[in-house]
């Protein structure tokens, strides 16, 4: 079946509609009639609708186990356009394919750093001066929104998309806190890498290329794992989207299967 939402997102992006409103418009329209897709707006300190950060929530079909909860974040740096694009298309695919989304709940912020995005800057001057990292008392609005989100639900996995202009292929760095996650997600990434040429990944790296941004989460009973996916500038937006989807879907399936089997 043709995924018209995904097609609209791709066509609008190729036509130059890379701003947040243009990017998410097809998803927001689809959410009006969807049984699984919800669009929300996370409030900031101004409480103004125009300053709220948009997010999407996919609630997959009921399964005989607690849902696997995953948070996906893109656009942490305001001049990124490919990580938001990849997330938008990922959500469109999850909404369309009930088999992929069954037993999972996914919350996605395509453009977390809305302020920097609107100024087309990596970070704003204020964010550079005061810091823009979680759990370091940052006053940045997007940081506070994500911190609240990480305490709102007991997430199993946080996926952070970043653009790496120096990378020649998509790579991933993975921080696995729980022993069960080390087994389940480690095996899933190993299997994915065996079938995917040029995909590199590291578990709990001592000298990471990307600093993890969201974990460890303070004052929670169980830590989520964090996967940082670096998008290679050598790939086209379409190729990057395919890479992201392949990695995320492999991890979702592994977590869901493990929970269903009582191994998670």
Task: Please report, for each region that a protein language model flagged, where it lies by residue.
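Conserved beta-strand scaffold positions in the cores of enzyme catalytic domains, especially
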Residues: 39, 55, 108, 158-160, ...
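Short glycine- and acidic-rich boundary segments immediately preceding or forming the N-terminal edge
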Residues: 1-54, 158
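Glycine-rich, often proline-containing surface loops adjacent to acidic residues and nearby aromatics
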Residues: 66-72, 226
